[in-house]
């Protein structure tokens, strides 16, 4: 992952503004430790911190058009860049081998109306010096983070993380996924829209296992483009195991040559983390042996996790309970991954949102309710699992890719008949995924019950967090929580504890408002609480909150 930051709509360029932009970028240098670049001109300053994945030698940013009249800062990966390059061969004089440079070619040809042509994950700012206009855009689901702010003088600020904006502008907010901001229009607009968000569109559709298998294998294959060593996150759960097995299938050949040459790093490395004896570690070992990866198992202690909490909250920029719980082991794991020279990993985020894999989906009363909840979950994912995976890894300069959220794959998976995804009663969740890839996995994993990452790393991790935070926050503090935190007032002591640390790092109201705060059972939306009367008095994101479904449920 790279980092971008900068200032737009500048009336008069000054040294002070350039220095400010540099300081903003320095705050997110962990995202791009390989190189720094800055553009100052017209009414814009664009700064870039680079993590080199594709074309490490010549792909530095900001990127420029051949006449240097357009400049681009991108955090992202454009998976179909080779197809776009081929389309513009002889029509556009590419300056680098960077996958992101195709954005400039598309802009030259189509103006701002090209975002649907891109397959990838991205957040970018394009400044047209000739027209003195700019375009900001973010990928469909929000895999890549982006924030936008302003000051009293009308200048516009942007940054990959809160820390690039906190204290630098007067207010800021999340730049919404699937949206763009064109300076000529002056407001954020949606560019990504799909019919499958409506139940009426999908209710009579087919649901073929083979379609899921082909589409996901193609997504993984697309996302293996890399000029640096890569690996897979292998928790031992279904989702990461499927991604790992597919990646192993293609790892021996270089996809940039369509398999015509051997891969530069043909041996696939897999990574798992947990407390000693954790459920995930046992299953991850089984999968690694079955598919043949070089497996790395990292043990951490509860105390090591507790010691990292303050840093974790600083890097992930949230006080959401389930995100903090799950981000801590991922943050620790990312440090080890980077120490081994790995810069990119594939991960299994998104499957539970797309296929209704969380255990509360067992309670969905109708196919329509099930489908509408998956759509809601996808629309909010940028504040939860996308944020966790991106920021936990980028804290150590590691890029995460998520094939289950691939744009083309979503158009297949979200168009499936919701009846085929449902899991009433004790029926296993994500059956269609299990059936599609059962032959590629050990049976014990292919049919393993859903285990949330923060649970699977070891049940004592969450149990200790609840105990520690209960002791650290007094009843009196909870009584006055609304006075101290009027925005998203903490509802329990664990929330209060994380919120207190967050406020130390990010004291502004703008920061507080970027974090979601809604009642939830095992990661549900607030709307899904109506599915079961037992949910209504619970506010616990762990999968063990779903009594009668989880095999180790709270009693």
What are these regions (language model features)?
Residues 1, 339-346, 365, 370-555:
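Adenosyl-5′-phosphate
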Residues 104-105, 241-245, 331-335, 356, ...:
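Short, hydrophobic alpha-helix immediately C-terminal to the catalytic nucleophile
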Residues 125, 321-331, 375-378, 474-479:
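Short, basic, helix/turn surface patches
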Residues 273-334, 360-369, 391-392, 415-423, ...:
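ATP-dependent adenylate-handling ligase core
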